[in-house]
Amino acid sequence: MRLLLIYHRMSKNNLTAGLINFIEDEIMPRYENFDKAHDRRHAFTVMSQSLQLTKFYEVDVAMVYTIAAYHDLGLSEGRAMHHTASARIVREDERLRQFFTPEQIETIADAVEDHRASNLHEPRTIYGKIIAEADRIIEPETIMTRTVQYGLSRYPTLTKDEHIERAVAHIKEKYGRGGYMRLWIPQSQNSVRLEEFRMMIDNENELKRSLEVIYSEQKACY
């Protein structure tokens, strides 16, 4: 992870060694307590994509980096309202005051709260749009794997067929035509990837076959 951040520090931004060390040493380890669909690797991916999107906007890179680091911490209190819990964690973390003003911290908290894909409202700021877009990792195999992993972690008593049906229903509800997935950054590649994924979702038999292969691979890990 440090190599990625060193690369980004070579461009004009305000990421400091102090903030990077704080995030990596104090914040990122908290993701190790979450399920595989929301683990440290996922957080790192969201951080990377968030930083890549900063090249399209005049934004505070340190804030974008911090938003991505905190966006899923509220999972420690459950999934249903994790976005609001994550925002509260930001507001209550006094350590952030050594890096940001109160106004910046409030913007960070708002963006963290706005990141969730099922939110009905548009993110309030460009920071919210960046984290929301970065968290939408539209790569079919990754999405299907994370969906299966989450099901195995949360619903261990389900049969194989029940897991597959749950995964199909979730993927259709979120990514299918008419699903609640919304994209906010026109410069990202997500719109093209989403349409490609929807073509796969349209063929439910193909979707189920792919999920069955992933289920067999992941089941051995649980």
Region roles according to the model:
Residues M1-R9:
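N-terminal amphipathic/basic-hydrophobic helices that include classical n-h-c signal peptides
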Residues S11-N14, E32-Y57, Y70, N119-Y222:
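Divalent metal-dependent phosphate-bond-processing catalytic cores, especially two-metal-ion Mg2+/Mn2+ enzymes
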Residues S11-P29:
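Short alpha-helical hairpin
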Residues I20-D25, R40-M47, A62, I67:
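Short amphipathic alpha-helical segments
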Residues V46-M47, M81-L96:
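An active-site-proximal "capping" alpha-helix that borders the catalytic cofactor pocket
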Residues V61-G78, H82, S86, T107-R116:
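His-Asp-centered metal-binding catalytic motifs of divalent-metal-dependent phosphohydrolases/nucleases
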Residues I89-R124:
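Hydrophobic, well-structured mid-protein blocks that either form specific transmembrane helices
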